[in-house]
């Protein structure tokens, strides 16, 4: 049975670069913070540039000090581009959004780090399938079928070629 004055849950610190709509990995980190807050958790981002689209309060010195004084140990979530533990978190989660080292970082993580992958093809050895957490970074207000079925065009397809355009698309499609 839950106590009336139960212990305050751990907050989440999301180590996220400044928001850019054009960078899907950055967008996903901001979306993660928003999703945690909408699920009733306390979460913050380290970014200075935020999106008005998401609930992403900044992690400030005042917030850090308040949590320290309350004896709270945050859960720190880093994207795969960050090596080490710059926020000195006791509980560290790595969100593998791309192949480690593809964009930045060398993929050096702590042996106690908890690993989650953005998709199945990014699962590293030892990570089970239940550690896939896919947050689609595209804006469904833009990339969706028209509401009016008469305006839908059969056979039209949209592809994302990836950061470096490495995806081969068969022209016959």
Segment roles from a protein language model:
Residues 173:
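Donor nucleotide-activated moiety binding/catalytic core segment of transferases
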Residues 1-75, 167:
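N-terminal pre-catalytic "stem/leader" segment of glycosyltransferase-like enzymes
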Residues 29, 50, 66-169:
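Catalytic core of nucleotide-activated saccharide and alditol-phosphate transferases
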């Amino acid at each position: 049975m839950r106590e009336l004055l139960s212990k305050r849950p751990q907050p989440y610190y999301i180590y996220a670069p400044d928001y850019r709509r054009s960078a899907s990995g950055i967008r996903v980190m901001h979306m993660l913070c928003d999703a945690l807050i909408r699920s009733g958790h306390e979460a913050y981002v380290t970014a200075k540039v935020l999106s008005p689209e998401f609930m992403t309060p900044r992690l400030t010195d005042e917030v850090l000090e308040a949590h320290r004084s309350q004896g709270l140990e945050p859960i720190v979530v880093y994207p795969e581009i960050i090596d080490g533990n710059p926020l000195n978190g006791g509980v560290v989660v790595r969100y593998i959004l791309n192949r480690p080292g593809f964009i930045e970082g060398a993929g050096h993580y702590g042996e106690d780090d908890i690993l989650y992958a953005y998709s199945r093809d990014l699962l590293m050895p030892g990570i089970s399938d239940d550690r896939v957490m896919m947050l689609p970074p595209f804006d469904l207000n833009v990339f969706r079928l028209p509401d009016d079925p008469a305006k839908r065009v059969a056979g039209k397809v949209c592809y994302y070629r990836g950061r470096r355009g490495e995806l081969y698309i068969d022209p016959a499609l």
